[in-house]
From Swiss-Prot:
GO cellular component: chloroplast thylakoid membrane; photosystem I; photosystem II
Protein name according to UniProt: Chlorophyll a-b binding protein 3B, chloroplastic
Annotated binding of chlorophyll b 5, by residue: Q166, F263
Job of this protein: The light-harvesting complex (LHC) functions as a light receptor, it captures and delivers excitation energy to photosystems with which it is closely associated.
Gene3D superfamilies documented for this protein: Chlorophyll a/b binding protein domain
Family per record: Belongs to the light-harvesting chlorophyll a/b-binding (LHC) protein family.
Binding site for chlorophyll a 6: H247, A256
Binding-site positions, chlorophyll b 2: V154, L183
Location (main, coarse): plastid
Organism this protein belongs to: Solanum lycopersicum
Gene: CAB3B
Notes concerning its domains: The N-terminus of the protein extends into the stroma where it is involved with adhesion of granal membranes and post-translational modifications; both are believed to mediate the distribution of excitation energy between photosystems I and II.
Length: 267
């Protein structure tokens, strides 16, 4: 250090004094200093869809610009979306989200089953019993539902027997989901994975995050459409696919307005 100081102050600079500690204004200059955040941007979801990514477009943006702190892309807890203020507290929001995911998964299966049964009937598979639309009436009748037209297959004479079987089966599955068992340990009870995910859809974390959002969104849609199926069946006495076929055949006459004055069910 001493040698460099002597070299700097030697006669090579022709008597010009060299400042070894220049002032701060000379270091930084007079330009404005701006600090820029260089954090990595979140990766878009694997499908590139604007609706299921982490920064999903909020459709209710017009109603309330400021999203609540609890609102993720999946559960929009804006004032308009949660009219009943069900997601006001964070703990309640988490519980409601768990219920929504479980009920949504059930509704997605139910809506598929309701449509599938009607599709099978339309494709001339001889289903002896009525479709799901009229099944509630048939279940209370003495003859009961003979699935797949074979009396010996699932010929449930008693609605209580059906109920007991459902309780046992669903109780076993839910018990595995919550407590673990021979199917594997529980990591996350809401999204159990393991044997509950035979296709391995949740192994990639990005795709898994996107699928969670899609599951909730499609589940809400399925719950609402299942409600619609029931209302249609009560009013028109037909299943959803029959109503759709009628509507496509004659969209002007066969639509909701034709039944808007019909308050006698199944007429």
């Amino acid at each position: 250090m001493a040698a460099s100081t002597m070299a700097l102050s030697s006669s090579t600079f022709a008597g010009k004094a060299v400042k070894l500690s220049p002032s701060s204004s000379e270091i930084s200059g007079n330009g404005r200093i701006t600090m820029r955040k260089t954090a990595a941007k979140p990766k878009p979801a694997s499908s590139g869809s604007p609706w299921x990514x982490x920064x999903x477009x909020x459709x209710x943006x017009x109603x309330x610009x400021x999203x609540x702190x609890x609102x993720x892309x999946x559960x929009x807890x804006x004032x308009x979306x949660x009219x009943x203020x069900x997601x006001x507290x964070x703990x309640x929001x988490x519980x409601x989200x768990x219920x929504x995911x479980x009920x949504x998964x059930x509704x997605x299966x139910x809506x598929x089953x309701x449509x599938x049964x009607x599709x099978x009937x339309x494709x001339x598979x001889x289903x002896x019993x009525x479709x799901x639309x009229x099944x509630x009436x048939x279940x209370x009748x003495x003859x009961x539902x003979x699935x797949x037209x074979x009396x010996s297959l699932v010929h449930a004479q008693s609605i209580l027997a059906i109920w007991a079987c459902q309780v046992v089966l669903m109780g076993a599955v839910e018990g595995y989901r919550i407590a673990g068992g021979p199917l594997g340990e529980v990591v996350d009870p809401l999204y159990p994975g393991g044997s509950f995910d035979p296709l391995g859809l949740a192994e990639d974390p990005e795709a898994f995050a996107e699928l969670k959002v899609k599951e909730i969104k499609n589940g809400r849609l399925a719950m609402f459409s299942m409600f619609g199926f029931f209302v249609q069946a009560i009013v028109t006495g037909k299943g959803p696919l029959e109503n759709l076929a009628d509507h496509i055949a004659d969209p002007v006459n066969n639509n909701a307005w034709a039944f808007a004055t019909n308050f006698v069910p199944g007429k």
